Amino acid sequence: MSDSSISVLPFIHAIKDTINSHADEIAHLDQAIGDGDHLINLQRGIDALLKNRDELEQLDFSAALSKIGLTLMSTMGGASGSLFGSMFVTMGKTAKEKPVALESISEIFTAGVESIKARGKADIGEKTMLDTLIPASTSLQESMTHEAELSIALESMKQAAIEGMESTEDMLATKGRASFLGERARGHIDA
């Protein structure tokens, strides 16, 4: 983005706080149908980002997003490191020369979500992170179309993400470890 004064650190701290406040839930969900390492991988990625806080503070917004992606790729285990890393690298590339506005944020986030779809060869309805991210992205796009205030757009986005996450409970998994469980994956929310 052209406004280099945007700091990513408050977002990283907010994500860390959210992960930590839901740590037991994340661990429980992943142990039920996943590899059981999702929480550890998320925490490892966030800790690596915070170790790079001085460097991240010196970068403009688009470069910081790209650096976040590269850091997540190199520090998080499992598929999520590659997927989240790809998302942030793509968002960084998309953010270059964009003004700070809801339309830009929507475009940047949507590009990141699309990169996960491409890398993971997945889509909504397959009991993956995309069942949360695609509704969040769609909500943000709709808010942009209706020229909503940012705070309202983000609240709508959060609600769409929660509803998307909850929708995975009755889905049959087609990707990841959960796909090997067949019908036994039903009744569990994807972590």
Predicted regions: what is each one?
Residues M1-A191:
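N-terminal loops that bind phosphate or other acidic moieties
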